[in-house]
Amino acid sequence: MTELSKYRNIGIFAHVDAGKTTTTERILKLTGKIHKLGEVHDGESTTDFMVQEAERGITIQSAAVSCFWKDHRFNVIDTPGHVDFTVEVYRSLKVLDGGIAVFCGSGGVEPQSETNWRYANESEVARIIFVNKLDRMGADFLRVVKQTKDVLAANPLVMVLPIGIEDEFKGVVDLLTRKAYVWDDSGIPENFEVQDVPADMVDLVEEYREMLIESAVEQDDDLMEAYMEGEEPSIEDLKRCIRKGTRTMAFFPTFCGSAFKNKGMQLVLDAVVDYLPAPDEVDPQPLTDEEGNETGEYAIVSADESLKALAFKIMDDRFGALTFVRIYAGRLKKGDTILNSATGKTERIGRMCEMYANDRIEIESAEAGDIIAIVGMKNVQTGHTLCDVKHPCTLEAMVFPEPVISIAVAPKDKGGSEKMAIAIGKMIAEDPSFRVETDEDSGETILKGMGELHLDIKVDILKRTYGVELIVGEPQVAYRETITQMVEDQYTHKKQSGGSGQFGKIEYIIRPGEPNSGFVFKSSVVGGNVPKEYWPAVEKGFASMMNTGTIAGFPVLDVEFELTDGAYHAVDSSAIAFEIAAKAAFRQSIAKAKPQLLEPIMKVDVFSPEDNVGDVIGDLNRRRGMIKDQVAGVTGVRVKADVPLSEMFGYIGTLRTMTSGRGQFSMEFSHYSPCPNSVADKVVEQVKERKAAEAKK
């Protein structure tokens, strides 16, 4: 087994097309895990092993790959850059100890890289920065370094400087050693020479080296004092300081190169070893109680502790069902019986594997720090804790965003229904941001997801991976309803039909809740007019009605119910009577509280060439967008806007037409906002028409 200090659990994340997957391929080639390089544009890369990934040239799922460099074991996760798949990035960050943030040398800090950077900050994942594609037209390393400061509020620590740029890019100067690494044009990563710094770069190298040392010695008071007195620190001391500053995110060591041309990658791998933390150098994962509150205990990273592991991904591939697991504490051996604390059920561990993209090596045991795959686990879902039967515990749960878009699907023939149900069951286990419901009125299967591409891929998987021929409906927006006015009201439920009857009277206030508060219930009943044992029934009755509003039947958001008084009967009152009273009270009062339709607003980030920015802004305005910011860069303009989701369908096609294929955009859910009356009327009419059409079937 590799000792814990030599583990590096790292993720590679960035914007679409910044070169994440190619960077991963080069890491695997250099570490000896693959022999023929696969290119993303050929649809051959090792970590993009779904058909849909290979065809579209994007990474959709996070593939976990193990490899070795200088006696250190890397568990590498290649994450998607497309915003519809940020749940994969979030899920990966949960189990990583460090990361490589890849930026394009010409495109710089692009929309999705900003989102992923924010997620990594929230997860407190230490990172190094790799500015890729320096061989591209318009590449500028120092401009991208400045962008990371200005756009991401990051503190990049420049570790290398490029030798040449664009077609003339030959290699890099390592500022610590003052050595130049120069590659030939063969594309073979080992074909480089170590030379002296080019004469025309000496002054620039000394300038940046001094800045590097000044930042590094801030991590050690004694070294800083010695440096101020004219004593230069040793390279070992500087590396120790850089490692400390990287772990605390005081700065981010920044490198550059060209993954595609195999230039500069070895220094990035050395940096992973030298600067990114081992599993026992990051804050331990907190343990929680059943409600999700922290208990004050932690999963201490040690093989000698009791088992604490997190299932962070479920995948069904050609080998069978795989559960990807990060072991935080303890050991896991083939044949062990472990407890799933989420279900309370035990499972026996069959086969365990180290993953190499879509290949695997079976192993007999694993321990704290490992990321492995277990074959054939039952009843395990993403976010479940796997632990020692004698020492049950729960790790901090994963929280996934609510879907904002849905489509109706149906099999083309009756025989496809069962096949579709089995396939969808597997897909839900694999992707927690993918939800499926059955429409009660029409009986249709409704797929819900994070965006158009997300659902496109799901439909594609159903058709090609599982062979289900589908009829696919138009995308539908996840509208919501709320109220705008307080109502004080009462309701009595009374039913007498021989013997004991039903009786429950409630007096209550319904008022608009705080934004994002969802459903809030409280009671201010004084005395015993409504006994305490019936309060949960009243709450349950109100809560059960939040799924269907009165305007168009959409779920209701941000409403507060306060039970103020009421009455009960010693014989006829029961929990069910008060629950029925609350349900009827909801229907009675919600219509009086001036209900309002809400629509999802998306945070849209568009990159446009300068020549087309007027057209782009005009188009966003026509889509009812509110422009929030405009930032001019060297290669174009970033436009940030809040736009209703209903106006964004098919936007990528329009943007490509307006910008001759050069525009890019990312989009993520921001908040719900009141619909204009004209839009609300149209939505209500569409719902009525849909229901009428379903009634005729």
From Swiss-Prot:
Belongs to the TRAFAC class translation factor GTPase superfamily. Classic translation factor GTPase family. EF-G/EF-2 subfamily. The gene is fusA2. It comes from the Bacteria. This is Elongation factor G 2. GO terms for molecular function: GTP binding; GTPase activity; guanosine tetraphosphate binding; translation elongation factor activity. Residues 5-280 form the tr-type G domain. Catalyzes the GTP-dependent ribosomal translocation step during translation elongation. During this step, the ribosome changes from the pre-translocational (PRE) to the post-translocational (POST) state as the newly formed A-site-bound peptidyl-tRNA and P-site-bound deacylated tRNA move to the P and E sites, respectively. Catalyzes the coordinated movement of the two tRNA molecules, the mRNA and conformational changes in the ribosome. Signal peptide: none annotated. Keywords: Cytoplasm, Elongation factor, GTP-binding, Nucleotide-binding, Protein biosynthesis. GO terms for biological process: ribosome disassembly. InterPro entries: EFG_II, EFG_III, EFG_III/V, EFG_IV, EFG_V, EFG_V-like, EFTu-like_2, G_TR_CS. One of its GO terms (cellular component) is cytoplasm. It comes from Shewanella sp. (strain MR-7). GTP binds at residues 14-21, 78-82, 132-135. It holds the Pfam family GTP_EFTU. It is found in: Cytoplasm.
